[in-house]
Amino acid sequence: MTTQRIKERGSILVYILLGVVLLGLLTIALRNAGTGGVSDIDKEQMILKAGQAQKDAAELAAAVNDLIANGVSEADLRFAHPDAPTEYGNITDNPTNQVFGKQGGKATYKSPPEGINDGSPWEFFGSSQIIQVGSDRSELIAVLPNVTESFCKGMDAQLGFDPTLQPTDNSTGSSPDCVMGTSSDRFTGTFSDASPNVLDKATFSKLPALQACVYCAADSTYNYYYVLLAR
């Protein structure tokens, strides 16, 4: 075997080994890029869904304020709908007072964006006093219950809260004990002004908090609220 052929074979072997190394590096790079891509997509989807939840809540607030402007009292506002829990009543009762009624607020009854909670519908309460909003009375709020922790933290970050400080609704042991009330707390005209649920001011890095996602210590759930009517 000539020296030239030996050199050629040696060069081929070097190229083969170099190709294997480069292929391995490319595989690692693509894998890392793929992981980052999925993460970016998930983050983008979360941002879009958080924005959709805020938009839906803002539309409800607009409907409530339209009814108030048209002379409906805050105690006469109703949130009945065929797909809503029965405690909210019948949408055909006093139709001009119904937030979702065609003769009332004309709001669209929407399901939460998919994947951000356990599928529970929007709820409506007058049992929580929101920090630095209105007076010392309870506000009328919409609540998106049982959202995921990741959605909650993402929502609060998007709203400008300190990411190291989770807004919290501490437990007092008495009812109401969370922005997400019980079935008996569903709004049908009565506000809990005498003994409202009060949030933990020290955990809110941004005030007033007309909307936020809070951790409820009473049942270890995360719930997003939006003030429909400050009082």
What are these regions (language model features)?
Residues 95-231:
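Intrinsically disordered, low-complexity regions enriched in Pro/Ser/Thr/Gly and acidic residues
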Residues 41-72:
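Membrane-proximal N-terminal amphipathic helix
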Residues 2-38, 43-53:
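N-terminal single-pass transmembrane signal-anchor helix
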Residues 64-106:
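Short, glycine/small-hydrophobic-rich surface segments
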